Amino acid sequence: MEKADGAAPGWYLTDLNARAATGADFLAILDERGTPVWYQRLDRALIDAKLLSTGNISAAENESRFSTKPEVGHRMIALDGTLVDEWLTDSNDHPPDKHDIAEIPELPDGRAIISYPLLDGVDLSSLAPDQSLPAPIRCDGSVAGVDKTIVDGSIREISGDGTLVWDWNMSDYFGMEEVRIPLCFKKYPAENSGAGEVDVFHINSLQRVVEDDCGTECDYVVSARHLDAVFRVDRPTDAVEWILSSSPESLENLSGAERLNIVGDPHFGPLRPHDAILKGDILTMHDNRSLTNPEEAARFVQYRIDTSSSDSADWTATMVRQIESPFGFSSGALGSARLADDGSVLVGWGSLQPVFVEYGSTGTELLRIAVPGVTPYRIVKYAPDDFDADELRATAGNTTQAPPPPP
């Protein structure tokens, strides 16, 4: 803890995954002074820790880049470390991805997952892979052609018994001309004649927007890193309602959705966004600005969305404020940003600078916690009543129960 000066009471839930192969991995809950009150040692690195309505904590195995194992789901962990359940996918062709999961309390054990299914026969002639990117993630120029293989982005609502309730796929609504930074992680190295699959969308955050008594059909706000875009999906119709993107407004969306007119943003929109959250008309995100040349500082950015005009061409996203990384670097990857009702903001500054900072409504630092040697994915602040301090202390210090090995 480097600074604690005025943060409102609350509980800070995060993962602390060791950079070194010999290090230990933990889930942890800190108080507003940055003091660890609860922790559980893990059998392996888990990310996307969040509190569910049941009082359990969900977290997912941190497979590199994106998840490819259909037999590995999101763990439901009690505070004492007991494995309560594991939420799996509905289909082996749709492995549950690690980046995010949205609870659907209206369905018993219901959830919306992200998946990166393989999709063959795609025309990638419009792609121009950036050959200046690092070799481990760079796409070979040969992937720019016809009949290629990508990983799609799928949102899948699944009931507690594993039944698919609803699904939605990126490739039905976004064209390859909209891809800004295709990467090839070679999770499937035999694809595309050895060049590996092309990750053209890369969904990395999923928020279920609970409003207007939406019941089981609530909209979703989605962040797609490789489109440099955040967008809203209308759940009842499947349509993309709007897109906030740094792409030119003249770039037509495959489904005809409007790109919001960005007002007052000196960067004209996000680059490699993450952790997009919509509350009312306020949209926030962690804008990684990664893989930029020259390097640009990561930032928290807040927009006000106005879709009141009868003409969707007049819809706007007006920047309310931004907070740039105190180090002046991009985030590389990871990163989170959460706006509280009192105007304070809690930011996890990503993989290149593992620091959590909470800012007051005027931008003053209230809390700074440095976590060297680990790569935390996200940090979320919960209200004082969401956890009991005595229970946290009483259940701390165990090793979480791991699921049995798959058959």
Where are these regions (language model features)?
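Histidine-/acidic-rich catalytic cores in large beta-rich domains
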Residues: 1-407
